[in-house]
């Protein structure tokens, strides 16, 4: 608003300048002192240079105006064309700023360029800065200024998000706007920046189309004809020069064209009388404005200048209503509503309503600011009082310094512990350093955290162990069924500790298929031994710092998992479970499996060195238990440090016992059921195991049991039944269609097909080997006598080598048994192992492949319900294989009655439980010659009969 007052002064000074311009001829071109001082005050108010000085403002902006024509002493033509001359002259670089001389605003000016603005309309007597970027509109405004027609129509757009300077249709703007005069125009090349002042309200009548610029010379000719008509009243005429109208025509019917010119008409106010109601409204508006000024200092300067500009605003209700609306931050449509209102009384009411809203908003802002300030004061006061209280207590000896309190806390932790001397030396050194550090330094926090970890380790503190064999055995039997090897090893550990009179650490590794209870048995062992339990998984771990910690200098450094374990368990002899040790990763941060070597080495972990603590820690009393699915992926040095215990899968009888003893009661408790509401018989569980859960573990069986009981709970809650009886007949209603409907692929094996036994991480399974002719056998031709063997079924390299060895031995064995049979020598044979999507590898199918090739060559099927496993050498020797328990379980599950195993696996078979080997005929062989009569008993019988004859 200060700029507004400046422009008013400048306008008055310019009028005086125009009136006294003829005196320049008398004074010799000197500016009269009165006019000069007036102009200087006006220019200073607008931050402009005096027009006669010709000075260039900072930034290369030069002010030029219509007043230059007066100094040139031109006639009427010169006066009207001065703006054009001033706009085209250039005496400096940078954007050209044209300050237009104030002139008498015409009462009627129907044809105006249209400028569309957003958010806030321009009210009469108010100034606004407008930027125009549209190329056509920029050219039009330049032309109007050159023709001494610095008038525009400013209209508000209906859409506040539309940032365009022009509109394509009159429907996009409100039709009531403001007739404005351009006071100053800064030409920036691609855009214009103007200061416009509103004068009166106007209404759009229609759209006009702008004629090309070539028609301007006609207007110039008309202007020159008026050159001789100048008389004594030339000074008065110059106060209000008659604007030169640019030729326009009515706009075409094409509505997509940009609206640049419009025809307007003035909006007249309704007649009104200054009644008591009007006086009351004006007084209330003035009072509200003053209240807003008192609350919000931002309005103070601008509003006071507007209200004290040499006139009483109260006496002008029209101006007061516009000023009240313009001061508010109301919505654009509300301000436009005030602009369009022609009834002065209603306009005053609307302006007062907007001012009241602004006043309430200002009060709310002031209240919020006061509350925030009050909170800040209270916090600051509380802080000062606390600091004073600390100083007073310290002076009276009632409270120690923060550093003294921290040191006492750390020493209190170590008072009842047996701390090694080298550790105590480090603690004393760090405490001495802590006392010299500033409380707010970063090194202070690092040292304090280090001491916190160092004093949180249970130096010399051990938990009381349970050395009662009977109690430990009862705990293990209570939690897990089977797993005799694991239980025996734990009881042996307790027995040794009892005889020694002290406990020791040990490193065990349980390996076996998923879901057999490797992780859960570790918790039971901790409970049986009376040790604290801590578990962390190393599956996918790639950072050595997870095990050995970070260096203390790093931001956010922490010790490794083992030190965290000691702090959490508060004992030196916990049971630590390192899960999924076979799935440990390796990354650019190091190899965690190598970091475990020090941790799991009984000779080294008595002085385990964590990177963060950097002092030796005794881990020799920790019982480490690792779990793995396969041991092949465990590095050999790490495997050598652990005692491997195989946790094999379960047979159907074991699964049934586990389900009845553990899984079903646990699932009933989770589902909120008891035995009377949901009953699962042994027949249902057996069918569930046989047709849905054939894997080695019981995790899937647990899921299926929970699924059955959840559906039973739903039926009871929904009111379908009071009790649910699950039977083999309705089992499919609970768990869906059976997953396994066939025990094995071939009920009767044809010639060329033999059942083998395989072992995977999921347990054992049966594996058929199929052989067939690839092309017809040649007859009579001596060419192409050498046969071939093609293998498929996604076999690994080891299994492919085993197939080639078996093929070579089968040809030799057949020529030995039947020299006249050259089937394997001349035939092209295809060998396939079904389930081709499953990768297969290993040498244990050698005997099975030899038998399948001989069966195809002899055209005789093998003994039904026969399965075999074993690696065969090139000379026919049968070598031992692994996974005997899993393979035996798989064979019994498939209904096999006769099994052929390598002789060296007799010890593994003898360790099996009687219920696994029950009903099986087992043959242990050392050479393939021992397998042939077992697999082909009929042939041996026929040969024996032939010998007898």
From Swiss-Prot:
Q: Which GO terms describe its cellular component?
A: cytosol; mitochondrial nucleoid; mitochondrion; nucleoplasm
**Which GO biological process categories is it annotated with?**
cellular response to oxidative stress; chaperone-mediated protein complex assembly; mitochondrion organization; negative regulation of insulin receptor signaling pathway; oxidation-dependent protein catabolic process; protein catabolic process; protein quality control for misfolded or incompletely synthesized proteins; proteolysis
MF annotations from Gene Ontology = ADP binding; ATP binding; ATP hydrolysis activity; ATP-dependent peptidase activity; DNA polymerase binding; G-quadruplex DNA binding; identical protein binding; insulin receptor substrate binding
**What is the catalytic activity of this protein?**
Hydrolysis of proteins in presence of ATP
Q: In which tissues is it expressed?
A: Detected in liver > heart > kidney > testis.
Q: Where is the composition biased (Basic residues)?
A: 223-232
Kindly give the InterPro entries that the UniProt entry links to this protein: AAA+_ATPase, ATPase_AAA_core, Lon_bac/euk-typ, Lon_lid, Lon_proteolytic, Lon_Prtase, Lon_prtase_N, Lon_prtase_N_sf
User: Keywords, A to Z?
Assistant: ATP-binding, DNA-binding, Hydrolase, Mitochondrion, Nucleotide-binding, Protease, Serine protease, Transit peptide
Residue range of the transit peptide in the UniProt record, numbered on this chain: 1-65
| Database matches in Pfam families | AAA, Lon_C, Lon_lid, LON_substr_bdg
CDD domains in the cross-refs: RecA-like_Lon
Binding residue positions for ATP:
512-519
Which residues does the UniProt record annotate as the domain Lon N-terminal?
A: 112-359
Q: What is its EC number?
A: 3.4.21.53
For region Disordered, the annotated ranges are 68-94, 213-240
**List of catalytic residues:** 844, 887
State the similarity comment: Belongs to the peptidase S16 family.
Among HAMAP family, the record links this protein to: lonm_euk
Subunit comment: Homohexamer. Organized in a ring with a central cavity. The ATP-binding and proteolytic domains (AP-domain) form a hexameric chamber, while the N-terminal domain is arranged as a trimer of dimers. DNA and RNA binding is stimulated by substrate and inhibited by ATP binding. Interacts with TWNK and mitochondrial DNA polymerase subunit POLG.
**Role of this protein:** ATP-dependent serine protease that mediates the selective degradation of misfolded, unassembled or oxidatively damaged polypeptides as well as certain short-lived regulatory proteins in the mitochondrial matrix. Endogenous substrates include mitochondrial steroidogenic acute regulatory (StAR) protein, DELE1, helicase Twinkle (TWNK) and the large ribosomal subunit protein MRPL32/bL32m. MRPL32/bL32m is protected from degradation by LONP1 when it is bound to a nucleic acid (RNA), but TWNK is not. May also have a chaperone function in the assembly of inner membrane protein complexes.
The entry's protein name is: Lon protease homolog, mitochondrial
